[in-house]
Every structure is written in structure tokens, then in C-alpha cells.
């Protein structure tokens, strides 16, 4: 019986990067069937593999039709691995659904994750979260990226412990093996470059770097520059760049535009440090990429980040820009501290799997012979009782 691999929920971002890394590293063969969006990164990952690919165009109706087609393949014993997202619609009872779950905000209801959205935009995000919660509940097994979120799923939201697994993140082969095939904008050669490798999602709190730049500007400290990877035409990018220009902070920022996974490694090598100021993450590939490429990491001080990074990062408070200024200045001025943080990051990375080990762990779970449909009580019920 073939293994169905459902990547249809993925269109961009870290999830797509992880899926491509899985396809490159996993020992898959013709006994697998991959369903995914029509994306060059997926097609490239499978180009030299004899793995059937069912590529679908973008659009909600194409997705619905494709997922119904996947569900029809089921006989109640067929395993479908969805990475990352809800299982195919209409598949409950037809397929044994194993899902990779990276929707951290669903497990932190105490955080107003969409506080930056108003009106219809906020309503849209709320409806999407409802669908994701409903879809995730219809899975049979759940794979999380961190122990912290897996514990929350079990202890606070009634996920059955014997059906919850953790597969820790690994550095993406696309990033580690990347060589640049595009011309990047010139980066200031005499500045300490801190890379924030992220899109313009409000959760990333990239705007906090403006407050950091203002604090540096007030001190006439021009030794630092933040390297951003934002799509130039995105409304959020235009607003951010307008704020930067309004305050006269252009010398503190360089936006290189969207960077494909296969080009990311070349950019990381050109920078001195990496940062992640997100309010919440399931797990960030920024962590393992910084450690693997021997760059110090600055990250939000929170339970989810400490659970993943241990002593392999400098913890900062984005709402208090002076904490970021102090961290950057120490990294720039104290070579021993810089080297120590790089070494600690490498030590934390040693506790994580390689891309091949991670892929093998996924396969060990989804190829188990004792997988069955879940017939127990509905998950999420504790959340309803607490609200």
C-alpha cells in the first residue's frame, strides 16, 4: 500500500522549506505519492527521485478537489502524512491521518495573536484559525516540533498522549548547501550586519528594529545595520520603509527582498548575527540555521524560545529596545562573548537531529504497523471548558 504525502497546505515560508528538506533527505521511493501545489521548490526537490508527484494549481477550489481525490483513495487503513496543516477534507475514517502541526498560536490562546489586525482582516484570521482547529482535531496522530507545545497539547487541550509525537527541527539541506545564483544588494562592508530572515508577518515584530535603530541613532552609533528579507511590493514592507525614511534611519537597514531557501545560506554567510523577535513560534528555522552556520542568535525571551534554544542564544525583549542594543554592542565589542555564544549554539545544535535523522524519524512514525483511526474524545475540549 502506497504512502500518501500531502503537502497541499504549503505555499511558502518555513513550512515549505521544511517539506523540501524532508523530500530531499527521506529515503522515499515509488511506494510514495506526493500531492502538492505547483511549486518549483517541490518539483526541484523531487527532480531526481522516482516519486510520483500530483501537482495542483493554486486556488481554494483546486485544493478542495485535490483533497477530495486524496480522501477517495482511502480504505480505512491507508496512511496519509500531511506536513504541515489539517488533513484532507472528507478524509476522517477513510484515511489514517498523521499531521505535522506547527500552528503555535492555537496552543497559546492567552496571546492575542492577531492584535495587529482589525475589522475584516481580523475576522478572516479568526475564521482560518477555526478551520485549522477543526481540521487538526480530525487527525489521528499529531507530530509537533517542540516538547513545549506537545505538552500544552496534552495537558491543556486533551490530545491523547499515545498519539502525540515530537520530531525536532533540523537545519535545512537547501540552506546549508546553498550557493547564491542571484545578485544580492550591496551590504555595508564596515558594519555589524544582523540578519532577520523573515517575511512581513506582524508576528515577526520587525518594526521593533526601528526602535532599536532610533536608540542607536540617539547615541550616534552607526556601527550596526539590519538586513531584512521583505518582498518590496508588500504593503507591510512599504509602510515599514516609509517609517524608516521618516525617522532618517536608512543607514541602519538594507532590504534584500525575498530570499529563496536555496539562496539563504549565501546570505547568512555574509552577516555577523541573526535575530528572531517573534511574539510566538512553533519553532523557527532561524535557530538551527544560525547555529549550523556559526552565527550568534538574538531571540525573544519567552518559554517557547528558551525550550528550543537553551543557552544557545541571547534573549532580548523586543518591547525594550535597549536590551537589543546592549546585546548587539556586546557581540560587536567582546570577541570572547561572540565566540562563546557561537560555541554554545553549536552545542545546542548537537542535540538536534540532522536532516536525514529527522526525515527518518518522520518515517518511523508514519510507517508504523499499529496505526489506527482515533475514536476517542474530541481534542480541544479543555479549551472550551476554560473559556
Where are the model-predicted features located?
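Membrane-proximal helix-turn-helix segments that form the acceptor-binding/catalytic region
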Residues: 121-142
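Short hydrophobic beta-strand element within catalytic cores of glycosyltransferases
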Residues: 296-299
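A charged, aromatic-enriched C-terminal amphipathic alpha-helix characteristic of glycosyltransferases
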Residues: 336-381
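Aromatic "clamp/platform" in nucleotide-sugar-dependent glycosyltransferases that forms part
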Residues: 279
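A conserved mid-protein helix/loop that constitutes part of the nucleotide-sugar donor-binding site
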Residues: 13-24, 192, 201-215, 235-238
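Glycosyltransferase donor-sugar binding loop
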Residues: 35-40, 224-241, 257-258
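Nucleotide-activated donor-binding/catalytic signature segment of Leloir-type glycosyltransferases, i.e.
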Residues: 50-51, 238-259
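Conserved acidic donor-binding segment of nucleotide-sugar-dependent glycosyltransferases
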Residues: 314-322, 330-335
Amino acid at each position: 500500500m502506497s504512502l500518501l504525502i500531502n503537502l497541499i497546505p504549503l505555499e511558502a515560508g518555513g513550512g515549505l522549506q521544511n517539506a523540501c528538506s524532508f523530500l530531499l533527505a527521506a529515503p522515499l521511493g515509488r511506494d510514495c505519492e506526493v500531492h502538492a501545489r505547483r511549486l518549483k521548490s517541490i518539483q526541484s526537490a523531487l527532480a531526481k527521485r522516482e516519486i510520483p508527484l500530483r501537482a495542483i494549481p493554486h486556488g481554494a477550489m483546486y485544493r478542495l478537489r485535490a483533497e477530495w481525490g486524496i480522501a477517495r483513495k482511502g480504505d480505512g487503513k491507508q496512511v496519509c502524512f500531511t506536513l504541515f496543516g489539517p488533513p484532507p477534507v472528507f478524509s476522517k475514517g477513510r484515511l489514517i491521518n498523521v499531521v505535522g502541526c506547527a500552528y503555535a498560536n492555537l496552543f497559546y490562546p492567552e496571546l492575542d495573536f492577531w492584535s495587529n489586525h482589525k475589522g475584516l482582516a481580523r475576522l478572516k484570521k479568526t475564521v482560518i484559525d477555526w478551520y485549522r482547529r477543526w481540521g487538526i482535531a480530525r487527525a489521528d496522530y499529531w507530530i509537533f516540533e517542540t516538547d513545549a507545545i506537545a505538552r500544552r497539547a496534552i495537558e491543556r487541550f486533551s490530545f491523547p498522549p499515545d498519539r502525540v509525537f515530537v520530531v525536532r527541527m533540523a537545519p535545512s539541506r537547501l540552506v546549508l548547501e546553498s550557493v547564491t545564483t542571484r545578485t544580492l544588494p550591496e551590504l555595508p562592508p564596515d558594519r555589524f550586519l544582523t540578519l532577520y530572515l523573515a517575511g512581513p508577518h506582524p508576528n515577526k515584530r520587525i518594526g521593533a528594529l526601528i526602535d532599536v535603530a532610533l536608540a542607536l541613532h540617539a547615541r550616534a552609533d552607526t556601527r550596526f545595520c539590519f538586513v531584512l528579507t521583505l518582498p518590496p511590493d508588500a504593503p507591510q514592507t512599504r509602510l515599514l520603509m516609509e517609517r524608516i525614511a521618516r525617522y532618517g534611519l536608512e543607514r541602519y537597514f538594507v532590504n534584500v527582498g525575498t530570499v529563496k531557501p536555496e539562496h539563504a545560506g549565501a546570505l547568512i554567510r555574509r552577516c555577523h548575527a541573526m535575530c528572531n523577535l517573534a511574539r510566538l513560534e512553533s519553532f523557527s528555522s532561524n535557530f538551527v540555521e544560525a547555529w549550523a552556520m556559526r552565527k550568534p542568535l538574538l531571540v525573544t525571551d519567552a518559554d517557547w524560545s528558551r525550550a528550543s534554544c537553551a543557552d544557545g542564544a541571547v534573549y532580548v525583549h523586543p518591547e525594550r529596545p535597549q536590551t537589543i542594543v546592549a546585546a548587539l554592542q556586546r557581540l560587536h565589542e567582546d570577541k570572547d562573548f561572540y565566540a562563546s555564544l557561537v560555541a554554545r549554539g553549536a552545542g545546542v545544535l548537537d542535540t538536534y537531529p540532522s536532516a536525514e535523522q529527522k526525515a527518518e524519524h518522520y518515517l518511523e512514525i508514519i510507517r508504523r504497523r499499529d496505526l489506527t483511526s482515533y475514536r476517542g474524545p474530541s481534542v480541544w475540549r479543555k479549551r472550551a471548558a476554560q473559556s
